[in-house]
Curated annotation (Swiss-Prot):
It comes from the Bacteria. Helps membrane protein MHAS_02168/C731_2106 (P55) transport triacylglycerides (TAG) across the inner cell membrane into the periplasm and probably ultimately to the outer membrane. Binds TAG in its hydrophobic cavity and transfers it between lipid bilayers. TAG probably regulates lipid metabolism and growth regulation and plays a structural role in the outer membrane. Also binds mannosides, lipoarabinomannan and lipomannan and various glycolipids in the same cavity. The lprG-MHAS_02167/C731_2107 operon complements the vancomycin sensitivity of an M.smegmatis knockout of the same operon. The keyword Cell membrane applies. A lipid is attached at residue 22 (N-palmitoyl cysteine). This is Lipoarabinomannan carrier protein LprG. It is a lipid-anchor. One of its GO terms (biological process) is lipid transport.
Amino acid sequence: MQTRLTAILAAFLTAVALLAGCSKSEESTATDLPDAATLLQQSAETTRGESSVHLLLRTTGELEELPIHSLEGDLTNTPAVAAEGKTTVTVMGQKVEDMPFVVADGDLYAALFGDAISLIGPAADIYDVGAILDPERGLANVLSNFSDAKSVDREKVNDVETVKITGKVSADAVNRIAPQLAVQDAVGGTAWIADGGDHELVQVQLEPRDGVTVTMTLSDWGKPVTVTKPAA
């Protein structure tokens, strides 16, 4: 009987030791993350040199200043700013889903309420998509203006292994990429940066106020984008 108890006790202690070993290993993995400031700088440099991207933008919460619920499309700033895709927006108090849009020569064309695509007006009156890739106003500038940045985890986003970084983004950087938000203070920010290669930006999220987020998920960096301007 004593031998059996000894065997059970030994098995129990072995299991405890193994669990302790696993916990220690997980802790060491969690602390073995790249330096946040260095990774942000590397990603900012990469982003600053990019001229096209596939973008998925989503918002949560009440955001009257930016009436975009979601937007997905291709964007380029070479040779000029142009974009094409679909968006869900609130227009005149009515939610319009999956509305086709084109941005060309500074103008926004869209198919409102199922109509044929037509000229709406200056794109910047709704949202200046050209700001996203602008080296001084866009995503690169957002990455360069993180403070209190910390690498907190490794996560897979769009099948890309990323390092998740949290911190604050300066009000100036937020207002440059989205002037409609008109924030007064630094806001919560999270960036998911590719763990390898040129450390491309995979996703970024801004929290202009409690319960409100703007998330951009990015892919196909550098892929050629051709946008045809609709007939007037």
